[in-house]
Every structure is written in structure tokens, then in C-alpha cells.
């Protein structure tokens, strides 16, 4: 086997009919975790339903349907391999909770792949003022996904097919608007593809002899190639934040007979190991970690990205819950947030939002109502420049700096210190009405919380 390949996460974005599913399906189909038997089964079903033209999107439809119904599908289905990486597709839009998932995302995407359709009129629809292309790209950038690849899809349906002129026109247009958002087009690979026919997906296309390949220049090293797969190989691997203090938002807390209380969650920053004394915020409970395990194997330490369960001493299941955050009691322990200042972008709200609005915030694993206490300034959502002080209202499309107060104790962090704990989705009327990143947190001075005996003992022996 040799050394395992690095894992990277991508998010696939673009307008509803750009061909995201077909393109993603193609990659999973050709390089991924779907076994031949499943594919044959899908093909047979497709033929019976008269969807013989199914090709790849069908694969994704099947997987999506299973995901939507909450069937835990074998997650390998959303993985594929390049020569350098194991790639996981964290989410593909079209999924109901896509925006929420992208923000509270169980994991941060390392790169966004933007698919735009080159067909006559299609590109224009996707990029128009109300097309989703812009919104997705803006979201990705706001949420800290700084690497981008653009797949110019459906090259087989341009007039004439595989038109170089059309490709160049689109590259020019897309470059202009991703630049406005904040991406540097020199660092972005633009690849003309057909997710359906496979042009430039895994192998160079004989249909576009004019295409001399894509090039990117960046300080971390430049790259060039012809296919989408090669562009994925050029993604810079993430540096996992092991050197930061520990932050581990809890997803669940279990009571396991003979073992005791076992909180479960994903390490976002830092490391957790047996013997460490951890503090849970906002409940302010401090105790010793007895053991850490992942997939039923004991670990000497868990690092960012690991989903772990850890056993804690003298803490009852009633003391800690989902949405709490564990951290190292001796190294910038997490604390309750009294209030925080955030930059929010209103995505789709039918009316106006004024001070006093109190929707639910989804931030890491916490789900808590927060009040928009003060609208401080309205800003230009691309440049961040101030447009007006103390606006009375905000409406869809606006960006603003807002002071927020949690309705119940909550632990959040500024995006610059701990990115996964510093971005949130604002939910109201069963949809995501806004997204935000936290600029600053006013932490509550912790009173004397519960410190278990084992924590006191551990402190003495150190």
C-alpha cells in the first residue's frame, strides 16, 4: 500500500442545470467507490424506467434520494481517487440543506469546483443576477473556501459543438466576476469539459485540439494540465490546525454501561488525548479524559478531522450535551459567549430584518436562537466597505455588521481564531435566510463551574 494518500474535501457548486450531478457522477463512476454490481443494478433500473440515457447523473440521483431519506449510505460512494488524493465530495447543491451544510459543514471544503454550462443561453441564465452561480461562489468565498476550479461544461452543446470562441468568452466573463468576489483568476484552473461524454474529464479530449491546457500561477507552486482530474490533483492540501488549542464541538453524548459518559464529536482544532483535563463550555464543567477512541480503536491522540468518542470521569449525561464545546482547560479553554459581532449576508428573507429579530443560529453543532441586538453598519458584500451606519432594516442581498446576543448559553469563537466555530447559518421559516462569520466575541467571565474530583487529582499530579 505504501503511504496513504492525503484526504481532501471538495464542494461542487453551480446553477441548477449546469450538469453538476453528471460531472460529479462521472468522477465517482470512473474513479470512485461504486462497485460494478451497484452500477449494473442502476443501469438495469434506468433502462427499465426508460432512462436509458441515464449515464452518470442517475448514480447521483440514487445516492441523493438515499441521503434525503436519511438512509446512511456507504459514504465511500461520495469518494473518488486522483493520483495524489482521496477526494470526498462533502455536498452537492440541490440537496435541501446544502447552504446550511456548507456552513455548519461537518467539514470545511478545501476547494470548490464551480460548474458552468456552455450551452447557448445556459451560461447567461446561470450567471444572471438571480442565477445561483454567483451566490454559490460568493458563499464559498465568504466561508473561507479559497481554492477554486472552474469546469466549463456541456462543451458538446455549444454552437458549433466544442467552440473555442464560446469557451474563451465564458472564461473572460467568469474571471471578471470571480475576481469581484475575491478569487484571483490566475490561481484558478479553467477546464472545458463534457461531464456527459467525458471530454477532458480524465483524458484529454480529441474534440478540442485548440485547447492547449490550463495553467495556474500561485506562490505555493504553479501547475498546468489538460483535464479536470489533473486540476483536482493541483489542489493545495490543507494544513490541519493541530497546533491550535483544542476545540471539539459535541455531536452527541452517550451513556455506555460499564464505561460511563462518552461525548462524541469531531476534533476541529488542536489534539485530544487521554490524561488531558478538558473544560466543556458553555456549561463550565471540567474533567479528565480517560480514553479516546475512533472506530472502536483506542487512540493515543486524536487530531483535527477525527470523529471520536472520549470517556470522561465523574460527569453525568445530564451535565453535557450536543452543541457544547470541549477544550483544553490549560490552553485557552472555551467559554460562554455573552454576545458577538458578526458579518452577515441576508440570502432570502421575504421581508425586512430589524433589530430585535431572533432567528435560530446553526453554528458548529449548536442550534440556538440569537437576537440581532444592533445593526451596526451596512456594507458592500464584495469589498466589505461601509455603505451606511446603523441601518434601520436589512433585506435580501444586504450584508451588514451586526451585534448578536444568544438566547441561551452558547459557545462560539471568532472566525479568524477558530474557523469552524466562527461561521453560522441563520434559519427561519425552515430555510437558511442568512449566513455569517463571527468577527469578535465578548466572552462571559466564567463563575466557578463544576470541577470533578478526577480533574483536581489530575491537576495535582501534574
Curated annotation (Swiss-Prot):
Residues 5-242 form the tr-type G domain. GO terms for molecular function: GTP binding; GTPase activity; translation elongation factor activity. The keyword Nucleotide-binding applies. It holds the Pfam family GTP-eEF1A_C. The modification N,N,N-trimethylglycine is found at residue 2. Transmembrane segments: none annotated. It is found in: Cytoplasm. Residues 153-156 are annotated as: G4. GO terms for cellular component: cytoplasm. It comes from the Eukaryota. Keywords: Cytoplasm, Elongation factor, GTP-binding, Methylation, Nucleotide-binding, Phosphoprotein, Protein biosynthesis. The keyword Nucleotide-binding applies. GO terms for biological process: translation; translational elongation. The modification 5-glutamyl glycerylphosphorylethanolamine is found at residues 301, 374. Residues 194-196 are annotated as: G5. InterPro entries: EFTu-like_2, G_TR_CS, GTP-eEF1A_C, P-loop_NTPase, T_Tr_GTP-bd_dom, TRAFAC_GTPase_members, Transl_B-barrel_sf, Transl_elong_EF1A/Init_IF2_C. Residues 14-21 are annotated as: G1. Residues 91-94 are annotated as: G3. GTP binds at residues 14-21, 91-95, 153-156. Residues 70-74 are annotated as: G2. NCBIfam families: EF-1_alpha (TIGR00483), PRK12317.1 (NF008969). Belongs to the TRAFAC class translation factor GTPase superfamily. Classic translation factor GTPase family. EF-Tu/EF-1A subfamily. This protein promotes the GTP-dependent binding of aminoacyl-tRNA to the A-site of ribosomes during protein biosynthesis. This is Elongation factor 1-alpha, somatic form. The gene is eef1as.
Amino acid at each position: 500500500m505504501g503511504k496513504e494518500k492525503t484526504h481532501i474535501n471538495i464542494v461542487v457548486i453551480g446553477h441548477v442545470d449546469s450538469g453538476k450531478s453528471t460531472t460529479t457522477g462521472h468522477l465517482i463512476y470512473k474513479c470512485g467507490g461504486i462497485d460494478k454490481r451497484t452500477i449494473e443494478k442502476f443501469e438495469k433500473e434506468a433502462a427499465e424506467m426508460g432512462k436509458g440515457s441515464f449515464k452518470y447523473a442517475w448514480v447521483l440521483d440514487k445516492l441523493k434520494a438515499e441521503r434525503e431519506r436519511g438512509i446512511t449510505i456507504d459514504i465511500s460512494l461520495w469518494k473518488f481517487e486522483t493520483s495524489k488524493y482521496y477526494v470526498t465530495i462533502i455536498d452537492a447543491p440541490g440537496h435541501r440543506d446544502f447552504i446550511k451544510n456548507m456552513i455548519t459543514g461537518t467539514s470545511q471544503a478545501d476547494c470548490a469546483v464551480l460548474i458552468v454550462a456552455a450551452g447557448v443561453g445556459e451560461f447567461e441564465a446561470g450567471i444572471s443576477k438571480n442565477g445561483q452561480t454567483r451566490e454559490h461562489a460568493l458563499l464559498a468565498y465568504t466561508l473561507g473556501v479559497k481554492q477554486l476550479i472552474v469546469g466549463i461544461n456541456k462543451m458538446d452543446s455549444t454552437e458549433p459543438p466544442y467552440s473555442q470562441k464560446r469557451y474563451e468568452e465564458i472564461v473572460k466573463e467568469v474571471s471578471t466576476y470571480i475576481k469581484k468576489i475575491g478569487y484571483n483568476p490566475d490561481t484558478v484552473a479553467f477546464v472545458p469539459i463534457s461531464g456527459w461524454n467525458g471530454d477532458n474529464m480524465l483524458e484529454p479530449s480529441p474534440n478540442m485540439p485548440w485547447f492547449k491546457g490550463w495553467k495556474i500561477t500561485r506562490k505555493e507552486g504553479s501547475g498546468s494540465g489538460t483535464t479536470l482530474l489533473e486540476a483536482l490533483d493541483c489542489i493545495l492540501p490543507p494544513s490541519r490546525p493541530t497546533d491550535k488549542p483544542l476545540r471539539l464541538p459535541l455531536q452527541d453524548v452517550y451513556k455506555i454501561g460499564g464505561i460511563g459518559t462518552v461525548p462524541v464529536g469531531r476534533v476541529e482544532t488542536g489534539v485530544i488525548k487521554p490524561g488531558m483535563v478538558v473544560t466543556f463550555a458553555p456549561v463550565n464543567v471540567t474533567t479528565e479524559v480517560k480514553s479516546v477512541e475512533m472506530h472502536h480503536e483506542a487512540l493515543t491522540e486524536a487530531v483535527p478531522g477525527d470523529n471520536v468518542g472520549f470517556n470522561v470521569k465523574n460527569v453525568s449525561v445530564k451535565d453535557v450535551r450536543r452543541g457544547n464545546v470541549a477544550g483544553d482547560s490549560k490552553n485557552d479553554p472555551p467559554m460562554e459567549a455573552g454576545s458577538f459581532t458578526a458579518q452577515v449576508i441576508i440570502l432570502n428573507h421575504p421581508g425586512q430584518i430589524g433589530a430585535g429579530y431572533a432567528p435560530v443560529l446553526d453554528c458548529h453543532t449548536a442550534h440556538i436562537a440569537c437576537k440581532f441586538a444592533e445593526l451596526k453598519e451596512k456594507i458592500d458584500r464584495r469589498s466589505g466597505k461601509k455603505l451606511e451606519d446603523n441601518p434601520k432594516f436589512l433585506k435580501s442581498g444586504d450584508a451588514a455588521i451586526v451585534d448578536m446576543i444568544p438566547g441561551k448559553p452558547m459557545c462560539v469563537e471568532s472566525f479568524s481564531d477558530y474557523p469552524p466555530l466562527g461561521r453560522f447559518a441563520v434559519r427561519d421559516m425552515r430555510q437558511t435566510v442568512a449566513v455569517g462569520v463571527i468577527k469578535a466575541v465578548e466572552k462571559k467571565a466564567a463563575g466557578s463551574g463544576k470541577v470533578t474530583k478526577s480533574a483536581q487529582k489530575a491537576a495535582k499530579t501534574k
